[in-house]
Amino acid sequence: MNCYICYMITHEYKNTYVGITNDFEKRLKQHNSIIKGGAKATHKYNDWKLAFYISGIEDKNSVLSFEWHMHHPNGKRKKDSTSKKYYGVLGRIYGLCEVLNHYKFENKNVKCNMTKECYEYIMKENKELYELLESFIEIFILENM
C-alpha cells in the first residue's frame, strides 16, 4: 500500500503549490526541473522547497479530496473576490485552517509536518495564525529539511 501525502511547496514564501504524492523527493525534483514530470505551474522557478505536508490521511481518494479542498478552501469551484486571502504561504495556512475546520477526518492520526523555516516565517509574520492552525491539528516541526 502506498502512503500518500498532501504537500505545499513554496518559492520565496510568495508563490505556493499544493499537490499530492507518494514519493516526495522525486516529486520535488520534478518541480525543480531536475527530472521530467513537474507541474506546469512550477516551471517558472527551479528553487521550490517544502513548507509543510499533511500525513495520516487513510487512502489516495481521501488525500485527493483534501487536496481539492486546499485548492478551494471556501468550497467554491470558481475563484471570486475572496480567493486572494488564500494567496502566499500565510493565505494557504489560513485556507488549511478553514479546510481542517470543515473537513471531517475519520482518522485522527492526521498531522501537519512543517519545516522549521516555514514555522519561523509564520511566527514572525502572524503568530495568531500559527496558533489557530495548532488548534485544529497536531504540528510537528521538521528540523532537517
Predicted regions and their residues:
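GIY-YIG nuclease catalytic motif and its immediate N-terminal context
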Residues: 1-65, 94-145
